[in-house]
A protein has these predicted regions:
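Nucleotide and nucleotide-moiety/phosphate-recognizing core
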Residues: 6-14, 21-78, 82-86
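A generic local secondary-structure boundary/capping motif
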Residues: 2-3, 56, 108-110
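Conserved active-site and cofactor/substrate-binding residues in soluble primary-metabolism enzymes
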Residues: 25, 29, 50, 75, ...
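Conserved short-loop catalytic and cofactor-binding motifs
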Residues: 18, 43, 93, 134
Length: 157
């Protein structure tokens, strides 16, 4: 789902993840929670699902891109890191099920020329879950916190 206010100083908030794999869908759940918030002009929400090259166009039309994604990095589930990745090598070593697709997408994004500012909120998960739409209690608790951090990042731009 895409919601847009204007094209002036456009900020794209892009949630990545598979909501059929529990905690792995954290990025999409954060975007869904932000849909209930009155967003400032120029802020757009996009459910990026498991990522694909179809996301290049909305990413390139933004002045700033804020990504929210899950990572299996050994940190406590629900830990949040704010990163400024430039290339796929700047991402956490172990992203989850869509690892290669998202990293390839970021590399292609920068190779195509227009490079808006990118911020990644990497949310640690414990493990991949098979076929469940429910997130763990730890991840459910962190959704409002991550949504707040993302909104703060968008407002600061």
């Amino acid at each position: 789902m895409m919601t847009s206010k204007t094209d002036k100083n456009k900020v794209l908030i892009l949630g990545i993840g598979n909501t059929l794999m529990g905690d792995e869908g954290i990025g999409v759940h954060v975007v869904n929670s932000l849909e209930k918030t009155a967003l400032p002009d120029g802020v757009e929400l996009l459910d990026g699902g498991t990522g694909s090259f179809l996301l290049l166009e909305p990413m390139q039309s933004a002045d700033k891109v804020i990504l929210i994604d899950a990572t299996i990095d050994g940190a406590k589930a629900g830990s949040v890191r704010r990163l400024h990745p430039r290339y796929s090598k700047d991402y956490p070593k172990t992203l989850t099920a869509h690892d290669i697709g998202l990293k390839d997408l970021i590399d292609a994004f920068y190779l195509m020329g227009k490079t808006p500012e990118v911020t990644l909120f990497a949310v640690s998960i414990e493990d991949l879950q098979d076929l469940t739409t429910e997130m763990s209690p730890d991840l459910n608790k962190v959704v409002p916190k991550v949504a707040g951090l993302v909104l703060e990042e968008a407002l600061a731009f």
